[in-house]
């Protein structure tokens, strides 16, 4: 079959509870469900005022973040970037990143390439309390 169709909300498991912190964090990974070969795709709904408790960087993967609803901020290395609805941010491999939702929450699609295969954790380094005020 030359295509795969899935519904992010209905077909993909919410793995948000695997992360520390906010009970209302929603995180759905579409890469395997869509049988993606060259890229990865994820969806996140972050509750108002929540900041991820860690930052992360990738050795090989470039990521694109698309703000679907709400707003917030991203920290990219040492720079803070404001996010609004329909903003798109490309993040190069090797760049540290973290994000927090504004008062309306933050809904984002995350697209990454190349696809990291069966063990995506081999490409990522995370650091707890990376973004401290």
Q: For the regions a protein language model found, what residue spans apply to each?
A:
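Double-stranded beta-helix
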Residues: 3, 98-133
């Amino acid at each position: 079959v030359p295509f795969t169709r899935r519904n992010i909300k209905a077909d993909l498991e919410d793995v948000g509870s695997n992360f520390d912190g906010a009970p209302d964090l929603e995180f759905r990974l579409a890469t395997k469900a869509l049988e993606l070969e060259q890229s990865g795709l994820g969806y996140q709904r972050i509750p108002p005022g929540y900041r991820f408790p860690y930052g992360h960087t990738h050795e090989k993967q470039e990521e694109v973040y698309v703000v679907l609803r709400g707003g917030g901020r991203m920290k990219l290395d040492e720079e803070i970037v404001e996010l609004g609805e329909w903003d798109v941010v490309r993040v190069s491999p090797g760049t540290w990143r973290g994000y927090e939702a504004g008062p309306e929450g933050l809904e984002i699609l995350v697209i990454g390439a190349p696809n990291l295969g069966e063990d995506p954790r081999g490409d990522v380094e995370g650091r707890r309390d990376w973004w401290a005020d």
